[in-house]
Every structure is written in C-alpha cells, then in structure tokens.
C-alpha cells in the first residue's frame, strides 16, 4: 500500500445554540459572548454600576474569579444565528476533497445533553443536518467523476448503548469488537449496504435513526441515550487501466455522541440513571484519550483506547490515520455553566492533538514480466469490442435499409427468373416469403391436372438458391397458367390493381395452408383422443367461417388453378382431406375411434371435389418418380413392437396404393352389413403375396383398416404400387359368388376370412400364381398359427413391376361371410 504522509491537527469548531423557551423565562444572563468568527469569551465580567441593560464593563479592575472572562480561540465559532448550511460549509464540505483522495475522515459532535449535537448532525425535516448534506455532496462529486473513475460505496450504521454495540440497519443482538492488523478495528456481524443513489442512502439513514434509542429526560425531551456512528466506505479506481493502476480506499465516520449529564439536573432514576452512568463513563474515557494524545505531541505514549468500546471504535478516527473535525456544541445559558465550561476546556485541549495522515492508495502495479500478457489481453479486448461494434452497426444499417421498403409478395419461380426488358431500371430486391410450399406439398392437393402440371414444371427450379426467388417492387404481370413457355416482360407502369390482385392471391394461399394444417391437427387429436371441449368449439368456429367463405367466394387467383376457377376453400380442403393419411402404427383403441372418422371441419364429400382421374394419373406417376430420387421419399424403417394377437399389414405411404374405377359388379344385399369399413378396391398384379392369416374372425383382429388409416406389418416387405391414391369411400360388402371369373378361376387358395391388401410386385410377366407358389404359402401357415412369422423379406431389387395390372375388389367381410367360405387346404 502506497501512502502519502502528511502532518495535521484536529480541527475544532464551536457552535452556540439559541436559548430555549425555558432559558428565556428564567431571565438569566448568557455565559458565552462570541467576539468574532474564531474567538469567544466565557463568563464575561459585569460592570458594577451603570444601566441595567449593560452586561459588560470596559473596566477590568479587581481580581478575576476562577473561570470568569476566559477567552477561547478555535478554528471556527458559530453564533446563535448560524444555519445548518453554514456549519456544513466549514466542516465536512472541506474534508470531502481529502476523502476522495484516499484519506480517512471523521466528524463528531461533543457536548452536554441538550446542547444541540443531534440537531447539528441529523437536523430535522426541512432543515437537514451534516449527515444528510454530506451524503448529497458526496454523490454529487462522484457523479461528476463517473466518466473517469469507477466507484463503489458501502455504508454501515451502529450505536453504542450501555456499552453494547447494535446494528441500526439490521437490528439483532449485541456485536463484538475485533482488531485486525490490516483492517484495524472491525465489528464482526455488522451489515454493510451498497446504496444505488443518494436517495436510497438517505432512506437507510432515516431507517437507522428510527431504530436508535431515545428517551426524554428533565434536561432534554428528545435525549439520545446512545452514541451513533455512521460510516461511509468508498473505493475508486481509474476506468482506463494502465501499467501503474492504483486503488483508493477511504472511510468517513460521522459520529453523534450522547451528551454528558448530571443526575442532579436530570433527576434520572432506574434505567435512565444506568444509561446516564454508561454515557458518562464512555465520555470520560474519550476525554482521557484526548488528553493522552494532546500530551504526547507526536511522541509514542500509551493511549487508553481500551477503556471503553466507544474509544476502541474511534481509535482510527481520533488519533490514527484520519482527518478529524470536532464540533463542540454549547448552551449560552448559565443553567449549564459547568457543562459549558468543561466542553470548551476539552475542545481547546483537542486542538493540540497532532495527526499523521496517510493516503490509502493500493498499488496494483504488475511485474515487468507480465507486461506482454497484459498487452495481449488488452488487444484481445479491443478486438472483441470492435467486432461487437461492427456487428451492431451492420445490423442497424440493414434495419435502416429495410424499413422504408414496402412489403413484397412472393411470385412463382418462372416469373421471378424472367428477364426484364433492356432500358428498364431494376429496383432493389429483398428476400421475402419464398415459395417454400410448391411441388412437395402440392401433391396433397386435389385440384385438376392442369394445376399439378404447373407445379411439376416449377419443382426443378426450386433447387436454385433462395436469391433467385427475389423480385423487384414493380412486379411484371404473369402469363396465364396454361402457357407452355411462360415469359414475362417488365412494364414500367404497372397499375395498382395488379399489386392488389397478387396480394389477395397470396393471402388466400396462406389461408388455405393454415386451414389444411388445422384440418390435419384435428384429425390427429381426434385419433389420439386428446380433443377438449374448448378445442372442439374453436374448430367449429373455424368450420363456420369456412362455410361462410365458401358461399361468398368470387375472387380469382392467377397462381392456383382451383382458386382461378372460383373454387371455394371448402372444396379445396375437401380434396386435401382425401389425400392425408396416417402412417403410424394402429392400436385397437385407435382403430375403434377412427373407424367412423369422417372429414373434419364439417366439409362434406362432393363429386366436384375430386379431380379428373385420367389426367391425374400420369401426373402422379411423374411426381412419384421425382420423390423417389429424394432421400426423404424412402419408406420409414419399421419399429419393432410387441407381438399382438392381430396381424399388422405394412404401412402404406400416402398415395402408394393404386386407384381403380368403381366396379360394376353387383353388391351384397343391404341386409348383410359389414363389420367395419374398408378401403376401396385396389389394382392387383398377377402374383399376389399375402400376409399371415389372423387367428380371430373379428374385423378388428383381421386388421380391418379404417377410412384413411392403413396399418403397418413389421414382418413383410413389399414394393408398393406407384399409382395415384383412390378416393376414400365406404363400399358395401361384395357377394363372393358373383366375383369375376378371372378371380374364381385361379388355383391359388383364397381366404375370404379377412380383408387383404393387394400389393404390386415385380415379376417377369403378368401370370397367375402357380401351384408351387401355393405350396410355399401353405408351408408358412403352421408358423402363423404359432404366432411367429417365417415369411422372408424379399429385397426390393428382385421385385419387378408387372406390365399390365388388373383390378380385384377388396371388400370387408363379416362373420357371416366367414361361415360361408372356408380355407382351402391340400
């Protein structure tokens, strides 16, 4: 610790308080006469004769009485008319400069009871004392130097009552005193607080004053029965670090001592008498310390600090490394003649105390070997700050550039990539809502083939970078969707109507996407039995809005063929609902709940909701080829599950089962009801591969598939067909006696005990199953009855697509049908 040594003495000021109403009523002469700002006379002599109003005589003849006409000279004398601000300017205001330079400072008020010590230190509301004024001035100076230095302020407030130390900010039991060789006198358990502002510090000071012990006596109605010590600690350090960095630590103590009192004048008894005795004891120890320090005159001598806890706490404030100011408060009335005389005598004695001041500056200098490391750390910090500054400026500049531009709408890729005519200025482009939902998501739409063909033409262009999808503010008019080679010529004067039309089209597309998402979410929640009444009411409200929109539709969209023809959102949602299928495993509970599942949002099935089948078929095949090239189009791996009683069929991807024309064969009579709904008939190849036979005759155990929910067979691998999905329907059971001769003429055993999914396999030519295949399948049946599947997993590379598939109706069977048809065995 580096300290600047400086010699000083205790600064002593005297304040004479105004007379009280009781002293004025007694009509006693004052015993204090203030001569000037530094000198006063105690108990001046009266003239023997003369006018009654004349108090002093110019004649000094005759012997002097002991204690009469004594002249005292101090650093400052305040008369009865002095204000709190005057006392502050000549006491703590001057030592604040030394306090901020790292010197310890102390200000304490000493005097008899009722002399005005507490009023000088604390003041009252509207007329604050030294403690409040010092705090306000300290924070004002700290804020002035805040740009150059960083400060840390801590405060503590305690009292010494009956020779016991108590915390005023956090009241608890009595505390002890310890002496540390480095820190000096410390009080373990004393709370330290860090105020954020001067106002918060004043609130803490007020709260501590309310906890202080005060009791009225005959000498003073608001007598303080304890010594209060308010301490402020300040740490300051330069904000710009250097090789020679210093830390300054200083402490300021503002002390309000209790007044000495005489039992004969206060008439104290009991507890008040014991309090007065302890106060006088601690003040006597303080007087002995002052006398010892005054007699020492810089020499090392014994100072009785340990005679009282008060003197132990004030060890650093009185005779140690501290700049000290003593305020002696006296009364001008002759009723307190002895107390005033003793106060002036001890104050005059304190002037002889010499102090050795040392600035508490802690050097943080580093060794020369650490200079290189410090320089590297500082350079890294500067680089990090510069990078943050550049990032902040770049973000602010980008935000400023985007703010004046109007919002832009996304257009198809064939429009955004069209060249502009030469001579036309192209405006700045910004990335907006790109056409993220083009070909991959358009597969789920049930629109006509023309719209799907347009989507497929734009699908390869989506692999381009996102920058290619940006477009200028003045957008060219798009060509008709039916144009074979769409080209766009930029028009400099595009009217407002085109922009509004594009905006409306984009909004409608966005609404359609949201409704489809809500429809799928409703289906999944209903399948999992997670729907709540609130959610059902919200979906019903959405359904009502969709129905109202379907009656009021009339807007045309150049991008969507369905919207261009004026098709409402309800019908487009209808087409979407048919292509959405669930591809997860099916449990018994889900099969029962989904057996009666219909289209959500209350959208009925209509003939116009389906697109043309003949035109959709080649389009679907083309999309399938595109999706097979993508890695995401591969079938999901089967998840191993616990074996159940029913047999699981392979999970079919959306659109994997082919669709056929409705069969014209006669249906089962109405009296024979199916046990559960079943999908429509499928396209069947020449070779049929069946799954294992279920044990039970129940439709659910036979894996009867709900409307849109196929099941997953974990034991069989198939190469599914690549035809477009068929329209979900609820066909009635088919009379097996009237099945087409093609099916009845086969030699293969056919088990009508359960609905069987027909899959397309790859073979050399479309031929009927042979006897060898039938035998192979019959050898598998014993293993099925034991619950273990022995069907081999055929690699997809060995299966080939047949040249010409034919249709086989796949109806659901009831228990009645199972009795009529038995399993054919050899």
Curated annotation (Swiss-Prot):
GO terms for cellular component: astral microtubule; cytoplasm; cytosol; kinesin complex; microtubule plus-end; mitotic spindle astral microtubule; mitotic spindle midzone; nuclear body. Keywords: ATP-binding, Cell cycle, Cell division, Coiled coil, Cytoplasm, Cytoskeleton, Microtubule, Mitosis, Motor protein, Nucleotide-binding, Nucleus, Phosphoprotein. Residues 411-429, 444-455 have a biased composition (Polar residues). Residues 368-403 form a coiled coil. One of its GO terms (molecular function) is ATP binding. It comes from the Eukaryota. The keyword Repeat does not apply. The modification Phosphothreonine is found at residue 668. CDD domains: KISc_KIP3_like. Residues 396-496, 602-685, 762-788 are annotated as: Disordered. ATP binds at residues 111-118. Residues 610-619 have a biased composition (Basic and acidic residues). The keyword Cell division applies. In complex with KIF2C, constitutes the major microtubule plus-end depolymerizing activity in mitotic cells. Its major role may be to transport KIF2C and/or MAPRE1 along microtubules. Belongs to the TRAFAC class myosin-kinesin ATPase superfamily. Kinesin family. Interacts with MAPRE1; this interaction is required for efficient accumulation at microtubule plus ends. Interacts with KIF2C at microtubule tips; this interaction increases the affinity of both partners for microtubule plus ends and is required for robust microtubule depolymerization. KIF2C phosphorylation by AURKA or AURKB strongly reduces KIF18B-binding. This is Kinesin-like protein KIF18B. The lineage of its organism: Eukaryota, Metazoa, Chordata, Craniata, Vertebrata.
